[in-house]
Amino acid sequence: LRFLLSTATLALPAVNTLIVVIASLSMIIGNVLALRQQNIKRLLAYSSIAHIGYVLAIISAVKVESAGFVSLYMAVYAFTTIGAFGVVTIMSSPYKRQGEAELVENFQGIFWQRPVLTAVLTVMLLSLAGIPLTAGFISKFFAIFATVSAQSWWLTAMIIVGSAISL
């Protein structure tokens, strides 16, 4: 992170262009692959690929605030991902066949059995998607703010498209 946030490194146009390309591909590919998943843990893993793209978008903005924005994004992302994985792990019953409890379809109607855990999982997933009134929304807002202030319109568009796909 220190290496990427150093002004000398990102001042090189080739390095910054490479980061923009990787960020764009990461956001789009990660979200598209997450859409196709039936396994909740794999869905969260592919979502992680997209979130790395959002972090790289902030890094490529090369502003003084970028380090703070990256730190905020990573803290929010870590909290929500650990929370989501934790709830999925708790909800996975040891009595079911291996991998069966991890299917998205097996979470249908789980609210009536475990309402508190379901509410926590819902909030975590809404935050990962960047829905307003969640910490994930604030993080994505700062990612958009960083790219707009750097006049990186391509990355701003990629963040918006990636967020729309993740919904």
Q: What is each of the regions a protein language model found here?
A:
Residues 1-167:
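Alpha-helical transmembrane segments of multi-pass membrane proteins predominantly involved
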